[in-house]
Regions:
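Catalytic cores of Mg2+-dependent Asp-rich isoprenoid enzymes
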Residues: 1-15, 19-181, 186-302
Length: 302
């Protein structure tokens, strides 16, 4: 299975800028799409064909644009997210407007093509607004509620892009995406703590007697924090496995792509285990070999 995403899939006529009305500091199309190769999970395998690749890249571009506005924008992030919300509304009404940010125009055209619920696109904005105001989550259920905005909409949009959406597939996809989000939170404990955010549930910190200050301390992690990460990894693995029937329910290129996402999740969790559940020594990254092994295993199952 090819796991390297393509470097560029701009349709003819799209630009590399930000449109005419974007606030200063909003990243352009080329900057966003140039980062695809560094992602944990395969965005668009070269085996998917140009039509599906273009659809996935449109979704990736929107998700990464919103994440960058919420995480890295140098100015007022809530105002930048408000701009993105307004830009999306404008694009949904006039998706061919050349004044739009190219990534917003691209995802609006896709939403019309696949008849996607625009609220799924807006959920990503809502999640990033929460990131500006909610520094932590008391319970695991609270964290799952956040994942319903930050991660699960992406899976549902991907299913729509594959013309494969059903209620059962939505449920499996939600499990997969929630697990992937938890894996990312485990990888990024130190980075999130530096940004003033704690995604590990407070009830779990208390259970494992982990002081929140430990999350941003210099490594290596102590035994209590390692125990907590081991617990979260096991929970994420269980949720990911519960969502795996999604792969078997799909056929053709959709099955290939979703197998890649699920395999990427298992490989990320493997990387945390290989690091002895220490999240403070730098975000553990999955090995390509592990990703291929997991992906192959998923694809050969009936």
């Amino acid at each position: 299975m090819t796991v390297s995403p393509p470097t560029d899939h701009r349709p003819a006529g799209t630009g590399t800028g930000t449109g005419t009305g974007a606030p200063s500091g909003v990243p352009g199309e080329a900057e966003i799409l140039g980062r695809m190769g560094g992602e944990n999970f395969p965005v668009a395998s070269a085996l998917l064909g140009s039509r599906l690749r273009a659809r996935l890249v449109a979704l990736y571009g929107w998700a990464r644009l919103i994440d960058q506005l919420g995480d890295d924008y140098p100015g007022d992030r809530l105002a930048a997210l408000d701009w993105a919300d307004a830009e999306l509304t404008r694009a949904l009404g006039h998706p061919t407007d050349v004044a739009l940010h190219p990534l917003v125009r691209r995802v609006a055209l896709l939403a019309a093509e696949i008849k996607a619920d625009p609220e799924l696109l807006r959920d990503l904005i809502r999640a990033n607004r929460l990131d500006q105001t909610a520094a932590n989550y008391a319970t695991f259920e609270d964290l799952v509620g956040y994942c319903r905005l930050s991660a699960n909409p992406v899976g549902r949009l991907v299913l729509a892009a594959f013309d494969a959406a059903t209620p059962q597939r939505h449920a499996w996809s939600d499990d997969v995406c929630t697990a992937l989000q938890i894996a990312e939170h485990c990888q990024d404990v130190a980075e999130d703590a530096a940004a003033g955010r704690i995604y590990l549930p407070a009830e779990d910190l208390e259970r494992f007697e982990v002081d929140p200050a430990e999350l941003g301390a210099p490594g290596p992690a102590g035994p209590r924090l390692r125990g907590l990460i081991c617990f979260e990894v096991a929970r994420a693995r269980r949720i990911l496995t519960e969502g795996q029937p999604l792969v078997r329910s799909l056929r053709g290129r959709g099955r290939l792509a979703v197998a890649g996402f699920v395999a990427g999740g298992h490989a990320a969790l493997d990387a945390l285990a290989d690091a002895r559940f220490d999240p403070l020594g730098g975000a553990p990254h999955p090995r390509t070999r592990r990703l291929v092994v997991h992906g192959g295993s998923l694809l050969v199952r009936p």
